UniProtKB/Swiss-Prot annotation:
Coiled-coil stretches noted in the UniProt entry, renumbered to this chain: none
Organism encoding this protein: Pinus clausa
Localization per Swiss-Prot or TrEMBL: Plastid, Chloroplast
PANTHER family per record: MATURASE K
Protein name: Maturase K
Length: 515
């Protein structure tokens, strides 16, 4: 497989045309078997690994024989092990076959993605998840509307196979993929004749399907946007007096020639910026309201035409940043006007000029966070702390560490917001819930627990908070702290929380459209 990957660009045509013979190689299933054992051993203790997890080349040869006969009744999602355990719901060999299928399908796309990234010179692309917040601060204040879209999960298996045919010319290699997709759809008893492609399924096959599906959507969408938009991506930061700058442009255009109109007009073209966090892409638009409506209509037609998906209207919502708040990852986002007083001294006289700039204002969603803490049994619906009964069997250090980790994640993630007063309410809920949990464990009162532990409650997080506040409000950084924020971007830790309350917001939007 490594030699096959190292063939390079010259043999890319051969790789796309002759993938099917790889399914007849026993080494391929041995590699997939080792990868499956590595993943399963990390999630299960070693004593839970049975003798059925041993690789049997006899079974592998039987599966290869079925593929040679192009038998479309390959059983993958039911237990086909000759000596299975009674309580096992998934077949060990089906996982190995899925791993092998994924390895074969990843070959052309790994080469395609490598050379597509190397040849990307026209547009700037940032793939790091930590580039989301700098993008929001840089692009959102100079946009007047955003489109909040959701990538649909449900898609017909045949649509996925047809999209694979655009990149893989070896038609026989797609037969096992078609069999797997249809069998998975039938095993889930889906009445809508479609499969659910989600990024949260912890298997390499479905993660590959999700990444390919998103890549296909974005590649087609970007190519259409480039054709329809002739503007250049300019930095608005170099034009602080942009209002007066546009007034000067109007006078320049009257006396300019035709060959110079394009370079001047590019400054007034609508700007479209795209960012995606998980399954939620956001498009920031600088233009008239009619342009926003056209973009929203185009997204709905795009999904219906290319992927034969009927997208509900609530899946693509438009917001005006000056009036409404948008949600992106775990924040309520809005744009506020920030007047800056600039004083210039010239010829011993003082001139005062007021510059009004826009900046992103992320708001901490206190009410959704309290609702999620209520679902996790840290408090009730009104926000009153209660004891976490499921943690009373743990040691005192484990209980303190868990509450400490929750608070540090919340505080670090939402430190990018200027107004963090609501976080102290969350700290009060967690600290009192921790005290009640310890009191319930030791069958005592909260007063006794606080008297015994004292500053041990959230000691680590409090020290972090004090260091952060001392850095933020020191004498040297006091003036700078009013204009700057610190993004800790502890996204992997806070991701479940952000996704959970995002589902609550989606349900509210769906209810509004249903009414």
């Amino acid at each position: 497989m490594d030699e096959f990957h190292r063939c390079g660009k010259e043999d890319s045509f051969w790789q796309q045309c002759f993938l099917y013979p790889l399914f007849f190689k026993e080494d391929l299933y041995a590699i997939s078997h080792d990868h499956y054992l590595d993943v399963s051993s990390s999630s299960r203790p070693m004593e839970h690994l049975s003798s059925n997890d041993q690789l049997s080349f006899l079974t592998v040869k039987r599966l290869i024989g079925q593929i040679r006969k192009q038998n479309h009744s390959i059983v993958l999602f039911v237990n086909c092990d000759p000596n299975p355990l009674a309580d096992r719901k998934k077949s060990f060999y089906s996982e190995s076959v899925l791993e092998a299928l994924t390895l074969v399908l990843e070959v052309p796309f790994s080469i395609w993605s490598k050379y597509s990234v190397e040849g990307m010179n026209e547009s700037k692309s940032f793939r790091s998840i930590h580039s989301i917040f700098p993008f929001l601060e840089d692009k959102f204040p100079h946009s007047n509307s955003i489109l909040d879209a959701r990538i649909p999960y449900s898609i017909h298996p045949e649509i996925l196979v047809r999209t694979f045919r655009r990149w893989i010319r070896d038609a026989p290699s797609l037969h096992p993929l078609r069999s797997v997709l249809y069998e998975y759809r039938n095993s889930t008893e889906n009445l809508q004749r479609s499969i659910i492609v989600v990024p949260r399924v912890n298997t390499r096959f479905f993660l590959f399907l999700w990444n390919y599906y998103v890549c296909e959507c974005e590649s087609i969408l970007f190519s259409r946007l480039k054709r329809s938009s002739h503007s250049r991506s300019l930095s608005h930061g170099s034009f602080p007096q942009r209002t007066h700058f546009h007034r000067k442009i109007k006078h320049i255009i009257i006396f300019s020639r035709r060959n110079s109109l394009k370079s001047i007009w590019s400054l007034k073209d609508p700007k479209i910026h795209y960012v995606r966090y998980g399954e939620r892409p956001i498009i920031a638009i600088k233009g008239a309201h009619l342009l926003v409506k056209k973009c929203r209509y185009y997204l709905l037609i795009f999904r219906q035409f290319y992927f034969h998906l009927w997208s509900e209207p609530y899946r693509v919502c438009s917001h005006q940043l000056s009036k409404n708040c948008s949600s992106s990852p775990g924040y309520f986002l809005r744009v506020r006007m920030n007047p800056i007083l600039v004083r210039t001294k010239m010829l011993d006289e003082l001139f005062i000029a007021d510059l009004i700039t826009d900046e992103i204002d992320p708001i901490v969603p206190i009410v959704p966070i309290i609702g999620l803490l209520a679902t996790e049994k840290f408090c009730d619906i009104s926000g009153r702390p209660i004891s976490k009964l499921s943690w009373t069997s743990l040691t005192d250090d484990d209980i303190l560490d868990r509450f400490d980790q929750i608070w540090r994640n919340l505080f670090h993630y939402y430190s990018g917001s200027f107004d963090r007063d609501g976080l102290y309410r969350i700290k009060y809920i967690l600290s009192l819930s921790c005290a009640k949990t310890l009191a319930c464990k030791h069958k005592s009162t909260i007063r006794v627990v606080r008297k015994e532990l004292g500053p041990e409650l959230f000691k680590k997080s409090f020290s972090k908070e004090r260091e952060f506040d001392s850095l933020r409000f020191s004498s040297k950084a006091a003036a700078r702290s009013q204009r700057e924020r610190i993004w800790h971007s502890d996204i992997p830790q806070i991701n479940p929380l952000a996704n959970s309350w995002q589902k609550i917001q989606d349900l509210k939007i769906e209810n509004l459209f249903d009414q």
